[in-house]
Amino acid sequence: MISWINGDLVDLWQTNQKSFVLINCQGLGYEIQILESFFLKLKTNQISTKNITLWIKHIKKEDSDLLFGFTSKDQKNFFIEILSIRGVGSQIGIGILNKFSISEVINAIKTQDKKLICSVPGIGQKMSERLILELKSKFKSEILSEEEKSKDEFEIKDPEIIKMIEDLQLTLQSLSYKNKEINTILPIIIKEIDHLGKKENSLSFEKLLKLAMHYLDEDSSNKDR
């Protein structure tokens, strides 16, 4: 089994929306499917075509051997975890990593964002539900780590500001904004509170409400485009 390779680029091409490289490693040519982002960097000479190192997932089939190359071990391991899910093939795995970073996928799993997962070609509603369910158990520690990080980053200790945020949530709910939408913009508002608090002597509820509605309406208009 091939698990890692280092060599020089001989050729690169795309076919059927798949990206490939041919790597010369000690006189042998290895055809490897790679992520589109890495392909574009090679094509536009953003990175050297010499001494390319790829972490390889080697898949053996009856009639062929398939090599998938990744620029980091984390990408390779994430790809392997995706392939362990029933009904998910290699091209779905590549499609997910072509579209999102690992942290973006983990965040989508944490928030159960089926719409985001379904935006990957080949993934339907049922598969997105299965992916979220199974990956949530596989990446439990990563999800908990992200939640703790988020909690530490946005923890508020000032009782007056806590009360202001609670009032803001209730007011936005009374204005028919959904809880999911409100929770999405709260971290932004909390950052703004910190910024405004340093810049101005006092914070006004009216100013925060106006700011929150601006972000919510902007987010809504972007989704409608």
Swiss-Prot record:
GO cellular component: cytoplasm; Holliday junction resolvase complex
Main location: cytoplasm
Listed InterPro entries: DNA_helicase_Holl-junc_RuvA_I, NA-bd_OB-fold, RuvA, RuvA_2-like
Free-text comment about domains: Has three domains with a flexible linker between the domains II and III and assumes an 'L' shape. Domain III is highly mobile and contacts RuvB.
Name of the gene this protein is made from: ruvA
Function: The RuvA-RuvB-RuvC complex processes Holliday junction (HJ) DNA during genetic recombination and DNA repair, while the RuvA-RuvB complex plays an important role in the rescue of blocked DNA replication forks via replication fork reversal (RFR). RuvA specifically binds to HJ cruciform DNA, conferring on it an open structure. The RuvB hexamer acts as an ATP-dependent pump, pulling dsDNA into and through the RuvAB complex. HJ branch migration allows RuvC to scan DNA until it finds its consensus sequence, where it cleaves and resolves the cruciform DNA.
UniProt-annotated stretches for the region Domain I: 1-71
UniProt family annotation: Belongs to the RuvA family.
Renumbered residue ranges of the record's region Domain III: 161-225
GO BP annotation list: DNA recombination; DNA repair
NCBIfam families with a match to the protein in the record: ruvA
Start and end residues of each stretch annotated as Flexible linker: 151-161
Protein name: Holliday junction branch migration complex subunit RuvA
Span list, region Domain II: 72-150
Membrane-traversing stretches: none
Localization per Swiss-Prot or TrEMBL: Cytoplasm
Oligomer status and interactors: Homotetramer. Forms an RuvA(8)-RuvB(12)-Holliday junction (HJ) complex. HJ DNA is sandwiched between 2 RuvA tetramers; dsDNA enters through RuvA and exits via RuvB. An RuvB hexamer assembles on each DNA strand where it exits the tetramer. Each RuvB hexamer is contacted by two RuvA subunits (via domain III) on 2 adjacent RuvB subunits; this complex drives branch migration. In the full resolvosome a probable DNA-RuvA(4)-RuvB(12)-RuvC(2) complex forms which resolves the HJ.
Pfam families associated with the record: HHH_5, RuvA_N
MF-aspect GO terms: ATP binding; four-way junction DNA binding; four-way junction helicase activity
Keywords, sorted A to Z: Cytoplasm, DNA damage, DNA recombination, DNA repair, DNA-binding
